[in-house]
């Protein structure tokens, strides 16, 4: 298993990330494609987790913000690979990357159904719940 990253939106790594996100968010959850692929794509660092057989299994992206913060977005694991600890591996890789780049805080907007997952990784909820793409979400953050 290996996590790789890219900022190159023409790379195969990025295309694997988009394929995973399309399957999870557009096909499974009904998020409009126009909302899934956004203006921030070229500004993000895209991470993809590959199996030992080089099959893409999951993805997440980080959007650099100001004041030592990064926003974790588009966390997705393909359905056949869920509940195996792969999400934790991806998040930890993204956090390590952010910390090594001098960032000290990760922010995210979690689907409410994933709140417990992020809490187990040290994230805390803040602010009021909100709706995004027709689904309830909660703001969360973690100091690195």
Positions of PLM-derived features:
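Glycine-rich ATP-lid loops
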Residues: 79, 83, 103
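Conserved GNAT acetyl-CoA-binding A-motif
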Residues: 91, 98-111
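Short acidic/glycine-enriched loop/turn segments that link adjacent beta-strands
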Residues: 41-43, 68, 132-136
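Conserved acetyl-CoA-binding loop-helix of GNAT-fold acetyltransferases
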Residues: 83-96
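Short, solvent-exposed loop/turn elements at beta->coil junctions and helix N-caps
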Residues: 34-39, 128-130
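Short amphipathic alpha-helix that is part of the acyltransferase structural core
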Residues: 1-34, 41-46, 50-55
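Conserved beta-strand in the GNAT
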Residues: 48, 55-63, 71-76
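Conserved active-site alpha-helix within GNAT-family acetyltransferase domains
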Residues: 100, 112-128, 133-136
